[in-house]
Amino acid sequence: MTSFEDADTEETVTCLQMTVYHPGQLQCGIFQSISFNREKLPSSEVVKFGRNSNICHYTFQDKQVSRVQFSLQLFKKFNSSVLSFEIKNMSKKTNLIVDSRELGYLNKMDLPYRCMVRFGEYQFLMEKEDGESLEFFETQFILSPRSLLQENNWPPHRPIPEYGTYSLCSSQSSSPTEMDENES
């Protein structure tokens, strides 16, 4: 037997690829704390996203983001060998939109294999690659130069600012907006 035959087979690892976009990403450095490469994490870890670097694994440099915006947790469905992700909205101020479903504070759902996650002006295209390992999973971030909604033909959803005003880094559309007769 050769050393090749004796070598342990390496397990593949489940990976969640997240393509991210925000209109102010270049001017404001919103994603500057995020490493745009693959990162291996223990499968027991609850991964939190938000602006508080003491609590969150992935932080956004934006005061409009909640201290903890949302969390992802890996799990295995009963009688299944496939690992899945669960997403939970941790923000009391802003709903999290997964595809077309709105999640309020503490609402959670299974993350589809491919979906769009949005809050405010943030857009995340999340795509899962299955793996065999039960010990670890990986995350990978990719920065998109343009809106993911337009690029992937997702239904539009108007961003809702937390406090009724946009931050300096938010983009404001100069195109006409359709309004109801009773709106001012």
Swiss-Prot record:
GO biological process, one term: positive regulation of canonical NF-kappaB signal transduction
Modifications made to the protein after synthesis: Phosphorylated at Thr-9 following detection of ADP-D-glycero-beta-D-manno-heptose (ADP-Heptose) by ALPK1. Phosphorylation at Thr-9 by ALPK1 leads to the formation of an intermolecular binding between the FHA domain and phosphorylated Thr-9, promoting TIFA oligomerization and TIFA-mediated NF-kappa-B activation.
PTM sites of type Phosphothreonine: T9
Record annotation: effect of changing E178A: Loss of binding to TRAF6 and activation of NF-kappa-B and JNK pathways
InterPro entries hit by this protein: FHA_dom, SMAD_FHA_dom_sf, TIFA
Region (Disordered): 165-184
Result after altering S66A: Loss of homooligomerization and activation of NF-kappa-B and JNK pathways
Keyword rRNA-binding attributed: no
The entry's keywords: Cytoplasm, Immunity, Innate immunity, Phosphoprotein
All copies of domain FHA, residue ranges: 47-103
Residues making up the signal peptide according to the UniProt record: none
Places the protein is found: Cytoplasm
Biased composition (Polar residues): 167-177
Membrane-crossing segments per the record: none
GO cellular component: cytoplasm; cytosol
Similarity-based family: Belongs to the TIFA family.
Subunit text: Homooligomer; homooligomerizes following phosphorylation at Thr-9. Interacts with IRAK1, TRAF2 and TRAF6. Interacts with TIFAB; binding to TIFAB inhibits TRAF6 activation, possibly by inducing a conformational change in TIFA. Interacts with ZCCHC11; binding to ZCCHC11 suppresses the TRAF6-dependent activation of NF-kappa-B.
Function: Adapter molecule that plays a key role in the activation of pro-inflammatory NF-kappa-B signaling following detection of bacterial pathogen-associated molecular pattern metabolites (PAMPs). Promotes activation of an innate immune response by inducing the oligomerization and polyubiquitination of TRAF6, which leads to the activation of TAK1 and IKK through a proteasome-independent mechanism.
Domain topic, free-text comment: The FHA domain recognizes and binds phosphorylated Thr-9, promoting homooligomerization and subsequent activation of NF-kappa-B.
Protein name: TRAF-interacting protein with FHA domain-containing protein A
